[in-house]
Amino acid sequence: MLTTMLLSCALLLAMPTMLGAQIGLAPLEGIGRLDQALFPELQDLGLQPPLKRTTAERAEEALLQQAEAKALAEVLDPEGRKARSPRRCVRLHESCLGHQVPCCDPCATCYCRFFNAFCYCRKLGTATNPCSRT
């Protein structure tokens, strides 16, 4: 029973190959291009030829590539950029580790944790501090 079922499955799987193959050709010899197939009735369902681009589309694509190249060159060229003015303070919740500038908020202080490995500007609220959160 099992052998009959296995033989039937093998025949069903091999049937399309036997019916569609051309006599005297190996399976890959009949395919000259990607849009050709061994099965002539299925040739119309294959890959469509690529669409031809108009000159306007080509010009637009060239302009986009030039604009991208120019933008990339501006980003990567540090000499072409303006020099940034040094920041005079560190904002709240930003890292103040290694900075010699104070926090922007006068009520904030540079708060360090984990053996001074993680420091950031934070408002510390205490009862004696006039800037405490209430």
Swiss-Prot record:
Cleaved signal peptide residues: 1-20
Residue numbers marked as site, Cleavage: R84, S85
Annotated function: Plays a role in weight homeostasis. Involved in the control of feeding behavior through the central melanocortin system. Acts as alpha melanocyte-stimulating hormone antagonist by inhibiting cAMP production mediated by stimulation of melanocortin receptors within the hypothalamus and adrenal gland. Has very low activity with MC5R. Is an inverse agonist for MC3R and MC4R being able to suppress their constitutive activity. It promotes MC3R and MC4R endocytosis in an arrestin-dependent manner.
Gene: AGRP
Protein name: Agouti-related protein
Localization per record: Secreted; Golgi apparatus lumen
Source organism superkingdom: Eukaryota
InterPro entries: Agouti, Agouti_dom, Agouti_dom_sf
One Pfam short name: Agouti
GO biological process: adult feeding behavior; hormone-mediated signaling pathway; neuropeptide signaling pathway; positive regulation of feeding behavior; regulation of feeding behavior
PANTHER family registered for this protein in UniProt: AGOUTI RELATED, AGOUTI-RELATED PROTEIN
Alphabetical UniProt keywords: Disulfide bond, Golgi apparatus, Knottin, Secreted, Signal
Subunit details: Interacts with melanocortin receptors MC3R, MC4R and MC5R.
SUPFAM superfamilies xrefs: Agouti-related protein
Region (Interaction with melanocortin receptors) residue spans: 113-115
Lineage: Eukaryota, Metazoa, Chordata, Craniata, Vertebrata
